[in-house]
Amino acid sequence: MGNLIQTIPGENYSRVDDRAFTHNGCIIDLGCVRWNWSEIFIGKKRVIGADPFENEVPDGTELFKGVVGSFDGLIKMTYQEDGSHISNGSDSGDWIPSISWKSFCSRFNITDISILKMNIEGAEFPLLHSMDSEDFSKIDQIIVSFHDWMNPSWKHLTDASMYLLNQHGFTVHNIGPYGWYMGRK
């Protein structure tokens, strides 16, 4: 096991195991708006981000301008500076491409992942539960913000997701406020 480092200096929720720099896999940043979480890896590792509202593609990165979720298709989303969300029937919003985890990995030819980071405003639950043992076997570390702190009725989803990660060989630890957890194999 390596040492814990912060990808954003001074932010405990950004802690990762520094073995990511020597692990053969890529960095996946779901919810990569402003690229601040993954910036430390740009130019050192292959970095692939996904975010429907990110417009910048820094040199050394790849971007899926949409949502990585549990299905291929379209979803309606409302943009908010501090956390966009899937629109309900009465909300205005934009139709955004959604791609399943398997389709995302196929599109970007992803076979080995050093870190999968997810800050996707509640969509982490269906995404994680759409993944199978083959998907989890590709991942060395998972960093996720479970959003039950915003919606306490999602606590059971967080518990089920933590159980799922444990079942797939991850030791999960709380790393900061706002529901941030790190899972390492």
Regions found by a protein language model. Give the residues of each.
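Phosphate/nucleotide-binding beta-alpha loop and adjacent structural elements of enzyme active sites
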Residues: M1-K185
